Amino acid sequence: MEVAKTSRTGEWAGAVKSFLADICVRAVNAVGQVENDERMVDLDDIKVEKRQGGSIKDSTLVDGIILDKERVHAGMPRSISDASIALINSAIEVKKTEVDAKIQITDPNQLAAFLEEEEGYIRQLVETIKASGANVVICQKGIDDLAQHYMSKSGIFAIRRAKKSDMEALAKATNGRVITNIDDLSKDDLGKAARVEERKIGDSDMTFITGCEEAKSVSVLLRGGTEHVVDEIRRAFDDAVGVVSV
């Protein structure tokens, strides 16, 4: 703790300095791994988000992952308890092939059949996700509007276009596996969290995946009244983490 306080956080008032140092030490301790009787800390396992608004003491450590994302459909639940999380790095949409591009539809019945086939494909994807036991989907790529609709009807919370680094952090935090082929998705691939929740932070929404048992990746949300203050806090925190992790 004292080491953290003597880094760049020393530029702040005593109470704030202690507060940030405590978050820093707890974050490092949470992700530290013991190898050959030595503690190893991968700083990439501490995900830092910053958001203007509130006070410095609104900053917090989360035993899980914070995503600067909101759910893709307003009809989806805003929060999920006892979350089972599917981590998918492929698009949840109809696959377009060269054959599709060359199809010439001249009859209304043909068009109806074609659209029905596409809808059936999307519906089956969502049913496969649902059958795995997933009630949360984090997708690295896009999610088709129709897929959003069916997920919403099924009570699934979904996020699209998550960063690759966030997918990797989520896998570490939730003990889940990132999968490419939805047809192969099973309950064994799902990550676990006590809660997944969309929260209003400052002027926009963020998603908090919290209560991850034995999380090997954690998140810190840094707050401050102005952009300048938040940037300074981020620099101070990064400096302190670097010192503590040595």
What are these regions (language model features)?
Residues 1-246:
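Core, soluble structural subunits of large cytosolic macromolecular machines
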